[in-house]
Amino acid sequence: MTFSSAADFQDEFDVIVVGAGHSGCEAALACARLGCRTLLLTLNLDKIAWQPCNPAVGGPAKSQLTHEVDALGGEIGKMADRTYLQKRVLNASRGPAVWALRAQTDKREYAAVMKGIVETQANLVIREAMATDLILGANEQVLGVETYFGTCFAAKAVILTTGTFLGGKIWIGGKSMAAGRAGEFAAVGLTETLNRLGFETGRLKTGTPARVDKRSVDYSRMEPQPPDDEVRWFSFDPEVWIEREQMNCHLTRTTAATHQLIRDNLHLSPIYGGFIDSKGPRYCPSIEDKIVRFADKESHQIFIEPEGRDIPELYIQGFSTGLPENVQLAMLRTLPGLENCVMLRAAYAVEYDYLPATQCYPTLMTKKIEGLFCAGQINGTTGYEEAAAQGLVAGINAARFALGKELIVFPREESYLGTLVDDLCTKDLREPYRMLTSRSEYRLVLRSDNADQRLTPLGREIGLIDNRRWQLFQSKQANIIAEKERLHETRIKERDQVAIAIVKDTEQKIKGSLSLADLLRRPSLHYLDLDRYGLGNPDINLAEREGVEIEIKYSGYLKRQQNQIDQISRHSNRHLSPDIDYMKIETLSMESREKLTKIKPATIGQASRIGGVNPADINALLVYLEMRQMSAVKS
């Protein structure tokens, strides 16, 4: 690291963001929109917000994150709505807590549109450079960064959003090269700086499948996966809702020949050949991992997805591998429909450095260096949506730090975004982290449809929601409240013609009279049915109708979960001072003392989720806090 006395600054900023992927773009835009002069450093100005793996946004839990980022004033949801090739709602037959919108996006259009947004954003400067060193003050606080060629930039806060580029190395078979992703060089120097400053770093692995030429594929041998007829939106802002022609994806499957070919060549893969031992993503395994871990499965689904409207490349989802190129091509040609395929890009594995996020506060500022924030894959996550969510959190807090304002913690009970950050900062994760609906204990109340209700008021308070968005939000909430009141107050009598028709269709009796709200609570009846019987409200839109139906139909469950949240939060949100010396609290087990000392949780709730800290330790900690408070009062 360089100290300020040795630095000759070329320019001064409030915040510097290192890396212009999905995390870096959200962070930089948030900082600039909050009034901070911001510098966004990238290794390649032509690869801003690139989608190096699957060009898609959303899916289970990831769609909730995307809606939440949008509700706070972020960009990823708008980007997906502007550039989609296909949209589908996954899990539509199940409850609203797990509904998941997914968009296949146009890879090049996505990057071009985002590049235009960051280039025209006020307060935001973009520069092509590799940051290799941090410039620190006398108290080891951040003062700026130094690039590979020795240029120094000053800043009050720095956000590291380095993706897979820190010490990146790509592998195909037993051969490797230094690269953050294929065709782009790795970032050097920064890992060594972090190590010198006392940070723990580790290695993780991910991978991407081959791309094939769509002109060499026989679609008649595959099952079409059409888009939904009714287009849904990630953003709560109708200004970015662009209706456009959609494209099919396709489904094929692995065969016995595929599996045999993989088994015969396992020794040539980077992992099974022993060339690398970094942990890969559990929920996005390579095809080799699938064949080994699920040896009893005769076949695996493979989705064939377009990467753009005007390019020939197809993404082979579910077929990532690190096997040699000649083996890859032979494997691809065992898939029905791909017997004569032409491979345009080979699949590869990539390993990279990361910084376990237990070294960060839930604000994503590091505990060791004041003013240094980390977001995205450097924190051990995988996925564009996880990266974007962290980028927004880090951007908001870096801006507030630079402006001398109090930093914000997003509680896990109020958002998936909060759950994500809490897990990262609390749990000792040693494999790439992916957001899942099962990771949230509060998923009934943390739905996509109410992300704006939960987070837009906070986005407004922070300063990321403008007057137009705020008026849209207030109008929607007022319409939902008014419609719920109407449904509770409007009753139908058993002798009414409409009631007789409903009884006949549903085979459920109406005794005396029934409110429309009680009618809507029936499992088999939906708001669309109210419309059919002339009982709906034509003045409210689809999102408002869904919000009304969910809140009425699931009101009992939602109330119960909200009560649980309120009960837990009484103790969970109790603050733990960073100066507590846990090693001196003898009523704690030694393991919990060590874990608490290492992680320094911000709240009792965070402490309770640390592995090795049991309920008895939490009780002892609560007693300690009471005694500490009493002695403070006495003194």
From Swiss-Prot:
Family, as annotated: Belongs to the MnmG family.
Protein name listed in UniProt: tRNA uridine 5-carboxymethylaminomethyl modification enzyme MnmG
SMART domains: GIDA_assoc_3
HAMAP family: MnmG_GidA
Keyword entries, A-Z: Cytoplasm, FAD, Flavoprotein, NAD, tRNA processing
Cofactor: FAD
MF-aspect GO terms: flavin adenine dinucleotide binding
Subunit structure: Homodimer. Heterotetramer of two MnmE and two MnmG subunits.
Localization terms from the record: Cytoplasm
Stored PROSITE patterns: GIDA_1, GIDA_2
Entry function: NAD-binding protein involved in the addition of a carboxymethylaminomethyl (cmnm) group at the wobble position (U34) of certain tRNAs, forming tRNA-cmnm(5)s(2)U34.
Binding residues for NAD(+): 280-294
Pfam families: GIDA, GIDA_C_1st, SAM_GIDA_C
Protein's UniProt keywords contain Transcription regulation: no
InterPro entries: FAD/NAD-bd_sf, GIDA_C_N, MnmG, MnmG-rel, MnmG-rel_CS, MnmG_C, MnmG_C_subdom, MnmG_C_subdom_sf
Keyword Phosphoprotein carried by entry: no
GO biological process, one term: tRNA wobble uridine modification
Amino acids binding FAD: G19, A20, G21, H22, S23, G24
Predominant subcellular localization, coarse grouping: cytoplasm
One cellular component term from this protein's GO annotations in UniProt: cytoplasm
